[in-house]
Amino acid sequence: MTQFDNTPLTPPSSGAPGPAGWLPVWIKAISKPNEQTYVEITEHPDANSKTAYIWVFIAGLVSGIFQAFASTIRLAMGVTTQFPIPGLEQYIPQSTGVDGGSIGITLITGLCASPLAGVLSVIFFALGVAIVQWIAKLFGGTGTYDKLLYANAAITVPFTLISSLLAVFSSIPVLGICTGILSFGLGIYVLVLQVMAVKGVNRFGWGQAIGSVMIPVVVVFLFCCCVFAGLAMATGASLNQFNNFAP
């Protein structure tokens, strides 16, 4: 197991505080996959939770903007929504034509909702990091919420921006599969980096780091599966009753 030097690392400031100094931190966080990288990042004098919150808000805002354009492109191209419950589409009214007004309304609505996406991103990101750090503490971790928040933001934000751009290209049917595979690969890489960040910030072993990250992921996944299964069963029962009473 890698041995960490507990002496606080205080690298000299890059001389470019604020937005000008963000990009080097992001590049280091995603291009040097090693737990020591996140020790150095979080011990930097410029590392603080306020900066992390700003990063996440901007990423959520940009993601909302790109999603608005992606939805508009799909609407303009006549790409229909794929329903997760088989057979449900026949009971949902489908638009047979799209006019310019509908496209404009979709775009404006999406753009206006982008700031809300940024706020929600901050809330859920902060909650997720808090849960991971709480579990890490139970495993004997010595890190803090602020440090893990900063490290995770430095990892997640650049990939969120990249994924947002890919979402626009995924609206094109030919490129949809390619962007989907690429997004999946990036998601796995982000998960690995987050485990390294938890390990570096909390100064413990790989088992504790993996457990701290994966336990919440598994719990959320199982919860979503249960919710989806419940909705599918309820929807199926409702559709059966509708068919029975239909003339």
What is each model feature region?
Residues 1-62:
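N-terminal juxtamembrane cytosolic/stromal segments of multi-pass membrane proteins
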Residues 32-37, 75, 129-139:
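Hydrophobic transmembrane alpha-helix segments characteristic of membrane transport
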Residues 41-46, 98-107, 202:
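Helix-boundary and loop/linker segments of multi-pass membrane transporters
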Residues 60-75:
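Alpha-helical transmembrane segments of multi-pass membrane proteins
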Residues 74, 78-79, 140-141, 166-174, ...:
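Short helix-capping/hinge motifs at transmembrane helix termini and TM-loop junctions
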Residues 76-103, 241-247:
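Membrane-interface interhelical loops and short interface/amphipathic helices
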Residues 104-134, 145-220, 224-228:
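Selective recognition of hydrophobic, aromatic-rich stretches within alpha-helical transmembrane segments
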Residues 223-247:
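Juxtamembrane boundary at the C-terminal end of a transmembrane helix
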